[in-house]
From Swiss-Prot:
Other comments on record: Each trimer binds three substrate molecules. The ligands are bound between subunits, and for each substrate molecule, residues from adjacent subunits contribute to the binding interactions.
Designated name of the protein: Deoxyuridine 5'-triphosphate nucleotidohydrolase
Cofactor dependence: Mg(2+)
Species of the source: Mycolicibacterium paratuberculosis (strain ATCC BAA-968 / K-10)
Pathway(s) of this molecule: Pyrimidine metabolism; dUMP biosynthesis; dUMP from dCTP (dUTP route): step 2/2
């Protein structure tokens, strides 16, 4: 089943986002500008497109794995969230994680990928405690941040 996504091309000189391969989950987003990122620096990069995410769905902007592996280019707030009510240009908060080399992003480079997924819009219900609400007693409890074990050498 396919859902349509309305998209506005704000920069007619750029291609629309597209899938690299049939069946890929995400569509590639392109940089609308040239950007030089020094080591450890970040920049908010325009993509030249805006989308109308349908109600009950969310857009998630993920890094491109090849850029992360090859040159250390990633996204600061990964994944970036595009809520259904947002109608502005998609911008990507890129960061250069390479400790020594600058990264140059050129206009038209593929910089991120957009995935659109259904989301459950829950209603928050305040309870005084999980015990009283009958929601306590899991095997994990309040264990977090490393509670399931660490790396073999740590």
């Amino acid at each position: 089943m396919s859902t349509s996504l309305a998209i506005v091309r704000l920069d007619p000189g750029l291609p629309l986002p597209s899938r690299a391969h049939e069946g890929d989950a995400g569509v590639d987003l392109y940089s609308a500008e040239d950007v030089r990122l020094e080591p450890g620096r970040r920049a908010l990069v325009r993509t030249g497109v805006a989308v109308a995410i349908p109600f009950g769905m969310v857009g998630l902007v993920h890094p491109r794995s090849g850029l992360a592996a090859r040159v250390g280019l990633s996204i600061v707030n990964s994944p970036g969230t595009i809520d259904a009510g947002y109608r502005g240009e998609i911008k990507v908060a890129l960061i250069n994680l390479d400790p020594a080399e600058p990264i140059v992003v050129h206009r038209g480079d593929r910089i991120a990928q957009l995935l659109v997924q259904r989301v459950e819009l829950v209603e928050l219900v305040e309870v005084s405690s999980f015990d009283e609400a009958g929601l306590a007693g899991t095997s994990r409890g309040d264990g977090g941040h490393g509670s399931s074990g660490g790396h073999a050498s740590l």
